[in-house]
Design a protein with these regions (language model features):
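Bacterial N-terminal signal peptides that target proteins for export
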Residues: 1-11
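Bacterial N-terminal signal peptides
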Residues: 10-21
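A generic structural signal for short, solvent-exposed coil/turn residues
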Residues: 15-17, 36-38, 96
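C-terminal/domain-edge helix-coil "capping" segments
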Residues: 23-58, 133-137, 149, 160-227
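N-terminal segment of the mature soluble domain
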Residues: 53-146, 175, 179-183, 214-227
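Short, solvent-exposed loop/turn segments at secondary-structure junctions
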Residues: 113-114, 150-155
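Short low-complexity, flexible loop/linker segments enriched in glycine and/or proline
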Residues: 120-121, 158-161
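Short helix-to-loop capping/linker segments positioned immediately adjacent to catalytic or ligand/cofactor-binding
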Residues: 131, 154-158
Length: 227
């Protein structure tokens, strides 16, 4: 009897979700320029993620971060886990392997080439570093990632005092043109279904539990690249 009542409550919640969705606009947590799968790639490299956000980019990080000098990128140490850039690079490399297979340059090769690049934080930007890396590796496209929030949850999968929160932007650059042909931003702090019924789809897609920051990051990558 109790189980039947729980199912009824769940069905009502889902029904209300669709009703409310028709009356309100869902807050965007994923912003992406469509067409990633349509970009023809012969040889692609994933540049190691960069950590940071420029103050002037807070309102529009998608369009400005790529051209911000490295020295002007900053982040709150409490907002970004220490090795967030390394974790994100690994997660995205794994996801891109499924999409690009033989066209994706192995991570050790990219890491070695990136380490050899001369770097000048006062003048270098993520865009300029990506183009230099692409030329060095003879890649026609380079994926660039910038992470500016990576907060771990406080609690467990069943109960969390503070949820995980992850935010990052991705760009796919055409090396010859030096410009992005695709870009996307993921910015999400997990919410309970009881807090926002409009998030029901994401709530169930995430397993109806509180995710770790790593799990939320993987979820975000899947959302933006359409895996």
């Amino acid at each position: 009897m109790i189980r039947v009542q729980l199912y009824r409550v769940l069905y009502v919640a889902i029904f209300l979700t669709f009703v409310l969705a028709g009356c309100q606009s869902k807050p965007e947590t994923v912003k992406a320029r469509s067409g990633l799968s349509a970009v023809k790639v012969q040889r692609i490299a994933l540049m190691p993620f960069v950590r940071g956000l420029h103050n002037s980019s807070l309102g529009d990080p998608m369009n400005r971060l790529l051209y911000c000098t490295i020295s002007n990128l900053c982040f709150n140490i409490r907002e970004v886990k220490g090795n967030a850039d390394e974790l994100m690079t690994g997660f995205l490399q794994e996801a891109l392997q499924k999409s690009y297979a033989g066209a994706l340059i192995p991570d050790p090769t990219v890491q070695a080439a990136y380490a050899e690049l001369p770097k000048y934080p006062a003048t270098d930007t993520p865009q300029s570093l990506a183009i230099a890396l692409g030329r060095k590796l003879q890649a026609d496209h380079v994926m660039v990632g910038i992470v500016w929030r990576y907060k771990e949850r406080v609690g467990t999968a069943e109960a969390s005092a503070s949820p995980a929160s992850v935010a990052f932007t991705l760009y796919l650059l055409n090396v010859a043109q030096g410009t992005p042909v695709w870009q996307a931003t993921f910015d999400k702090t997990q919410q309970a279904l009881s807090e926002n019924l409009l998030n029901a789809k994401d709530f169930f897609a995430m397993g109806a539990r509180w995710l770790t920051a790593d799990e939320l990051a993987r979820f975000g990558i899947k959302q933006v690249i359409g895996e």
